[in-house]
């Protein structure tokens, strides 16, 4: 497994066919959400204002790998499993009803409908227009609804390991500013808009350590494609949380490395178009920093930590996969930090069993390693392909109970 531990979801498909006794388990996606802080990215910022680069045109309109299932989020209060292959993963009418973790007290608000920025540390008075791909800032087109939902997925994926709510629902100013005392609700507004006077040649911009101020001090995202827009939101919010840039050698921004499914880059760099983007601790060659992104995100001043562990770390505390029909099982979960593993169990009759464990988002940060055990705890098989970030098995098994460990 890659040393980056931040997150992403591992989706898995479990399928099993049996000749007798227990009915055959047919192919089905089981998915886990991995929230680890594997490669943590960082770099020293020398200025208070932290810009992100402009993404190349068309650099990332299509995901390098499409695993189908989108991150489960709350749509108007109901947990919903979207599909990244759909034009509107969560339904067109739900674009501004999305929330990743609505019970969290800390908020990352993705603001797409325009914003009047005044009375904050930017020292300006600007009415920023709504996000637009076609120049019409009064109405959202189908393409814009689709783009917003898919950018939202990218940001949720990056912050899913943490107890913070990424949302397109306007929480109100009081939920974004920290008034001190007994106030436990605060966050940051990420304004997705058009480049305005004074912000030329920037894909996004933010103030360092602006998360938790007593004012609404937004970050701004000008990159607009699916992944560069999503990554820029995560990058600029990262600055608000206290993160510096991840550079490479003499370059301020790490551009990413590799190709295909295992291409990689740090969120606090500029890895536009790479398949895996992760938080980093600067443990890559020619790094310009040793900053531990995950530890800084979790610092006390920001007010939140990891999410709680959702599945057991041993066979004795494994979660039974849900049997949705006689032949289909289903499940999902979150790997929330570097040392977390999740155990799942299933029972099958004798015969062929196929297992597929995939990161959920189109571009994830979890490189899955999965291990299959029998009821005695003996390892049956392990999967950690070098040319992909998912894991799979195709085994002829005796009837009985089995366990899957996702790492």
Over which residues does each language-model region extend?
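Post-HExxH zinc-binding segment in Zn-dependent metallohydrolases
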Residues: 258-289, 294
């Amino acid at each position: 497994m890659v040393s980056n531990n931040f997150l992403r979801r591992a989706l898995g498909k479990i399928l099993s066919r049996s000749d007798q006794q227990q009915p055959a388990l047919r192919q089905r996606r089981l998915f886990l959400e991995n929230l680890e802080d594997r490669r943590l990215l960082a770099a020293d910022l020398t200025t208070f204002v932290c810009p992100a680069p402009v993404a190349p045109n068309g650099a990332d309109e299509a995901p390098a790998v499409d695993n189908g299932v989108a991150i489960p989020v709350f749509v108007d209060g109901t947990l919903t499993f979207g599909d990244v292959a759909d034009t509107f993963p969560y339904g067109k009418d739900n674009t501004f009803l999305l929330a990743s973790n609505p019970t969290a007290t800390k908020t990352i608000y993705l603001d797409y409908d325009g914003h009047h920025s005044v009375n904050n540390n930017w020292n300006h008075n600007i009415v920023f227009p709504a996000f637009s791909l076609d120049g019409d800032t009064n109405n959202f087109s189908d393409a814009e609804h689709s783009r917003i939902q898919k950018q939202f997925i990218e940001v949720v994926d990056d912050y899913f390991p943490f107890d913070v709510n990424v949302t397109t629902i306007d929480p109100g100013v009081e939920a974004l500013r920290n008034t001190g005392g007994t106030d436990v609700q605060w966050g940051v507004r990420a304004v997705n808009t058009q480049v305005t006077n004074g912000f030329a040649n920037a894909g996004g911009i933010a103030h360092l350590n602006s998360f938790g101020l007593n004012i609404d001090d937004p970050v701004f995202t000008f990159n607009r494609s699916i992944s560069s827009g999503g990554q820029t939101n995560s990058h600029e919010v990262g600055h608000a949380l206290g993160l510096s840039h991840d550079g490479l050698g003499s370059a301020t921004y790490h551009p990413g490395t590799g190709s295909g499914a295992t291409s990689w880059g740090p969120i606090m760099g500029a890895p536009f178009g790479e398949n895996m983007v992760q938080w980093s601790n600067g443990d890559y060659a020619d790094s310009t920093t040793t900053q531990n992104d995950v530890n800084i995100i979790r610092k006390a001043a920001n007010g939140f930590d990891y999410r709680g562990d959702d599945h057991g770390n041993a066979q004795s505390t494994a979660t039974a996969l849900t049997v949705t029909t006689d032949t289909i099982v289903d499940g999902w979960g979150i790997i929330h930090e570097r040392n977390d593993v999740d155990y799942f169990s299933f029972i099958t009759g004798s015969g062929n069993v196929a297992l597929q464990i995939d990161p959920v988002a189109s571009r994830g940060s979890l490189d899955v390693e999965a291990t299959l055990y029998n009821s005695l705890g003996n390892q049956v098989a392990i999967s950690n392909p070098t040319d992909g970030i998912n894991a799979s098995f195709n085994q002829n098994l005796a009837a009985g109970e089995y366990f899957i460990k996702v790492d």
